[in-house]
């Protein structure tokens, strides 16, 4: 793949593989995603669900495995997004971070089960 092709590579992986870090035009997106990650690791998600287990072995994933669908995860994305509309700024942001984590869990389910 040429350097030009790498610049338009839609996976984004080449930036990290080549040690380039986060593209400046996507810095805010990266920060928001990292805030959602932090909420899952040390915030509400960790307090309620982590139990010193990897993300793939936490209830967020295991329940979907048991029922054979990621529909519950998608429901949570929708529910949290809708609930954020009735909240003030900071609680709404936290709720949307939760929606991001549920979306990531839905992606993980598809990657492992499709």
What does each model-identified segment do?
Residues 1-114:
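Intrinsically disordered, low-complexity regulatory regions
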